[in-house]
């Protein structure tokens, strides 16, 4: 079950003008609970004014068994991200959920692979953990990172990436692409999009060599990168995406759902609670929270999968899904923040163990 614990901030380190890395001290009794797969995220919770805010941030590293770190980049209008950058200090305590998320990769010591990461801006955060863990665990594996930023000054983890390159000079290929800073090669100037990746494919990179590809950054970049990799011959099952938000994406349900008055049974911590939806409820999660249920959630945008549950009976309509894998969908898992009941006998189980 997803659980929050109060963790003390061990240190806050600036990465760029707009970004910081926050490291939490994890007590020995909780270290197993905060063991993570590279690529997963933490959900942080705080109250600002009268509002409870929850936000997901990717785990960037775990430098010691008793520490775990996330990176936060302040964004325009982002109450939590600006609070994190400006107000969170060492010694403060924050409510932190145990690691969650489907994105990422668990390195295997015996495996020899070729991996690709495509990131832009703060999308580097989960990649740093994945790349570092993979190269240290799989001694014969190789990683290529294509990383886009406005300039070298806005580049998060610049020193950490340089250190990784020094440590694994033959096994890590790092390509930095800047949109507002010209380097010697025009190939490394501009934005990461389909045209840029096609140009790299013609001159520098054989994209068909990679066993797995990981993509994280702005939605348009991710969509372009995914489509281009498929066009270049990479199997869809080998392409993994992590979206931080769905801004600019408008989603409409495929079917009209009349959920007002519908009752849904929510199973959590071994107990069943019956909730009734109103016309104002946009999802099963909204209805349950309104009626006092303390369910796990964070983004409410279909991205983080924190609110994942399993449909035990009945049918639901899920408006959108940016996080569940096909095998999870086939097993009956849905995102409660995106789901409404289609039948009158729906039971959803938040205790069901998901697929890692």
Which stretches of residues belong to each language-model region?
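Ferredoxin-reductase
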Residues: 2-93, 97, 110-113, 149-151, ...
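Short acidic, glycine-rich loop/turn motifs
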Residues: 26, 46-48, 266-270, 311, ...
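Short structural boundary motif marking the start of a folded domain
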Residues: 3-8, 258-265
